[in-house]
């Protein structure tokens, strides 16, 4: 499948589609490293333009295992200034939901529109698109964790080593997924055996499958990377079931894990869709009456 000559994603010949279907990591190329929206100065301005709650920051000197909770949001009054001096201040920052700004939404959608033919049967199969920017000081560490979305991480500046692990048992994976929904932010309790490692340099990207443990070590320069995430119908449905189960656990009940009882799963997903729709309509009604 040939991509247009002005495309931003370089997926041909990488085995990306097959790896996606197997939910295995895969390397690919991209042409974003020189994009004007993704320079250090542009990202510093982006950090200042985003709502404070969309900026996460922490020290660059992290342990590989930090199992309890995640870093704080919104604590920096001028995050752009921190980004401009990352070579001095030993920090890393995550800018969440960059699609809140129209220019970044357009760039995100251009990239994911190019990816979609490789992974989806129908255009509607790529759901809940979101973009993130990660900027960090030299030799920073990102603790071991996993995400529930399909993720495409792409390096813009500097380099870093991305290492994947593999849960040794189904029970270990389920334990960590339950912890995620109960507030662990995906940060895992023990380091799993190493599965694969990739060296990310500008122009290189890697597909990160859902619920795949990984950790990151930066090189000797400031690192900038972009991650684009999305759900497919099956992963979106599982999030609904897991969200329902989390609510049940808060009521001191013990729900079955997704997949154990398919008919019950269907009812849980339907209930959460209805709950989400009610919240959406309630929010619209409040906005209209304000």
Model-derived regions: residue spans:
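N-terminal accessory scaffold of Fe(II)-dependent oxygenases
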Residues: 1-156, 160-167, 172-176, 223-225, ...
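Double-stranded beta-helix
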Residues: 155-213
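Catalytic core of Fe(II)/2-oxoglutarate
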Residues: 187-251
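C-terminal accessory regions
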Residues: 263-278
């Amino acid at each position: 499948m040939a991509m247009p000559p002005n495309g931003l994603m370089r997926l041909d010949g990488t085995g990306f589609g097959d790896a996606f279907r197997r939910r295995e990591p895969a390397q690919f190329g991209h042409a974003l490293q020189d994009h004007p929206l993704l320079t250090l100065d542009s990202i510093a301005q982006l950090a200042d333009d985003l709502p404070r709650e969309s900026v996460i920051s922490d020290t660059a000197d992290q342990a590989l295992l930090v199992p309890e909770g995640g870093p704080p949001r919104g604590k920096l009054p001028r995050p752009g200034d921190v980004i401009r001096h990352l070579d001095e201040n030993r920090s890393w920052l995550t800018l969440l939901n960059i699609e809140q700004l129209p220019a970044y939404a357009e760039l995100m959608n251009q990239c994911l529109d190019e990816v979609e033919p490789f992974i989806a049967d129908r255009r509607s199969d790529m759901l809940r698109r979101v973009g993130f920017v990660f900027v960090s000081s030299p030799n920073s560490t990102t603790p071991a964790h996993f995400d529930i979305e399909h993720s495409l991480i792409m390096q813009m500046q500097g380099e870093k080593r991305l290492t994947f692990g593999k849960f040794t048992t189904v029970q270990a994976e389920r334990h960590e997924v339950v912890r995620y929904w109960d507030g662990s932010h995906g940060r895992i309790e023990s380091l799993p055996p190493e599965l694969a490692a990739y060296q990310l340099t500008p122009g290189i990207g890697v597909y990160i499958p859902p619920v795949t443990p990984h950790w990151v070590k930066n090189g000797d320069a400031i690192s900038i990377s972009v991650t684009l995430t999305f759900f497919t119908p099956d992963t979106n449905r599982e999030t609904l079931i897991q969200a329902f189960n989390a609510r049940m656990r808060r009521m001191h009940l013990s729900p079955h894990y997704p997949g154990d009882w398919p008919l019950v799963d269907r009812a849980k997903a339907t209930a959460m869709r209805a709950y989400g729709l009610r919240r959406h309509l309630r929010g619209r009604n409040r906005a209209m009456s304000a």
